[in-house]
From Swiss-Prot:
It comes from Saccharomyces cerevisiae (strain ATCC 204508 / S288c) (Baker's yeast). Present with 876 molecules/cell in log phase SD medium. Belongs to the SERF family. Residues 1-68 are annotated as: Disordered. The modification Phosphoserine is found at S37. Residues 1-43, 50-68 have a biased composition (Basic and acidic residues). Pfam families: SERF-like_N (PF04419). The keyword Cytoplasm applies. This is SERF-like protein YDL085C-A. Keywords: Cytoplasm, Nucleus, Phosphoprotein. GO terms for cellular component: cytoplasm; nucleus.
Length: 68
């Protein structure tokens, strides 16, 4: 039986473990600061989504006007 892919599998497993460790380290620190930064990120995402929806609404209205 060939076992040539053990090294590759070990690398993949280690990369996954390192990603999880990095994610956990990101969650460390002052919870209040993290909560504020997360809230700011969500506000930015929401503002972008609102702007996109508004642009889509304007495009839809323009398309309806040109049909008439």
């Amino acid at each position: 039986m060939a076992r040539g892919n053990q090294r590759d599998l070990a690398r993949q497993k280690n990369l996954k473990k390192q990603k999880d460790m990095a994610k956990n380290q990101k969650k460390s620190g002052d919870p209040k600061k993290r909560m504020e930064s997360d809230a700011e990120i969500l506000r930015q995402k929401q503002a972008a989504a609102d702007a996109r929806r508004e642009a889509e609404k304007l495009e839809k209205l323009k398309a309806e006007k040109t049909r008439r």
